[in-house]
Regions:
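Short beta-strand-initiation
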Residues: 8, 73-75, 126
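Cys/His-rich metal-coordination motifs, chiefly Zn-binding "fingers/knuckles"
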Residues: 1
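Compositionally biased P/S/T/G-rich terminal and signal peptide-adjacent segments
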Residues: 61-83
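Sec-dependent N-terminal signal peptides
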Residues: 4-16
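Non-cytosolic coordination micro-motifs
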Residues: 22-62, 88-172
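Sterically constrained small-residue positions within well-ordered secondary structures
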Residues: 14, 69, 82, 121-122
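Bacterial Sec-dependent signal peptides at the C-terminal "C-region" and cleavage site
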Residues: 15-23
Length: 172
């Protein structure tokens, strides 16, 4: 009977762990670690990194990182330093002129539910919000310009590597 209880606990633990592996958990991204530690970046080759650029950006379908959440029309980007280190991971909404993807609010609602509330319709909305959670930074941005697609996304990085999001500003 005791062995059966232990077996059930092991099975439950594995189910919970497997679900969290599939979850879209930005805080689980190991910023500063080798790219091979992150699923959708694990298949890149060293020769894929441009030695002339301080940052190489890899893009993939968001489902490669977030298997259990539908954000609509989005991409996931991995920002790697020239030595193959993860500097940031970003989920970007792919809007067209009518901004249908952002109007659905799928990414915005995910960010609010996981990191905190904000109001993009406020007169004081600066266009972004940053949360410092432990050693990591979550950066959400949303900006509208007339006659242009809305820019919306969320990224995880840290103080040491946040400049990779500025691509040309990163210094090792």
């Amino acid at each position: 009977m005791k062995k059966l209880k232990i077996l059930i606990l092991i099975i439950l633990f594995n189910l919970v762990t497997f679900k969290s592996i599939q979850a879209c958990d930005l805080l689980s991204v190991e910023i500063g670690e080798n790219a091979s530690t992150l699923g959708f970046l694990s298949s890149f080759e060293e020769e894929d990194i441009d030695p002339n650029d301080s940052v190489t950006i890899f893009e993939s379908q968001t489902t490669a990182f977030c298997q259990d959440i539908d954000f609509g029309s989005t991409l996931v980007k991995g920002y790697l330093t020239m030595d193959g280190i993860i500097g940031a991971v970003e989920i970007v909404v792919q809007n067209n002129r009518n901004n249908r993807a952002s109007e659905q609010g799928l990414l915005r609602n995910f960010v609010k539910a996981n990191f905190g509330d904000f109001n993009i319709n406020s007169e004081e909305w600066p266009g972004y919000k940053i949360w410092n959670i432990g050693p990591k930074q979550i950066f959400y941005y949303y900006s509208e310009r007339e006659n242009e697609p809305t820019k919306e996304g969320v990224a995880v990085t840290n103080e040491q590597y946040y400049n990779v999001l500025l691509v040309n500003e990163y210094e090792n």
